[in-house]
Design a protein with these regions (language model features):
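Non-catalytic, mobile gating and regulatory segments of ester bond hydrolases
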Residues: 1-125, 129-187
Length: 187
């Protein structure tokens, strides 16, 4: 069941992540300890994500920034779907090539950072491209660290495009049952 207070907090966090990343502090949330991860300036991606550990709580937020620069839009238009195994490679799961390019730019750093947390309720969120990356990250982290680190997941996305084929949807729904995709009209 949707927690609308949590959804509203996710909206605010998604809004905050669009600020200048170098000066971002989430000062409206003094009980949050942030870790920032961004892709290296390689000319192919501009992926930015904040991992926010809510102090005195078992809650952790992963907030992805959406399309902000022209390089983001170039990745958005790489529609072709490809198999990107997040597991053993024997899969029919396919993902949007551009979104995976953006995700893989920060994947290693993100998984390394997430390996430091145990027993957390992980709230993954993002707007637009950030919502697509949140969807991919939740599936990847759940598969690779979820049981090992005793992590539970909820996903709140806003205006997120679809990221994969039907096999991906089935895998995702089986692993992330608490996922809420908010769209407006024909989003």
């Amino acid at each position: 069941m949707v927690d609308y207070d949590l959804a509203l907090k996710c909206v605010r966090l998604c809004q905050e992540i669009y600020r200048d990343f170098s000066g971002l502090r989430f000062s409206a949330y003094p009980d949050i300890d942030p870790v920032f991860v961004e892709s290296q300036d390689n000319g192919f991606t501009d992926t930015q994500v904040a991992i926010l550990n809510q102090l005195n709580s078992d809650r952790l937020y992963i907030v992805f920034r959406g399309s902000d620069k022209s390089i983001d839009w170039m990745n958005n238009f790489q529609f072709r779907q490809q198999i990107y195994p997040y597991s053993d490679g024997n899969t029919e799961v396919k993902f949007h090539q551009g979104f995976m390019t953006a995700y893989f730019a920060i994947r290693k750093q993100l998984l390394e950072a997430m390996d430091n947390f145990v027993g957390q309720q992980v709230i993954v969120t993002g707007h637009s491209l950030g919502g697509a990356l949140a969807t991919i990250a939740a599936l990847d982290i759940q598969y690779n660290l979820g049981k090992k680190r005793d992590l539970s997941f909820e996903v709140y996305t806003f205006g997120a495009p679809r990221v994969g084929n039907q096999a991906m949807v089935e895998s995702y729904n089986g692993r992330i049952p608490n996922s809420y995709r908010f769209v407006y009209g024909w989003d």
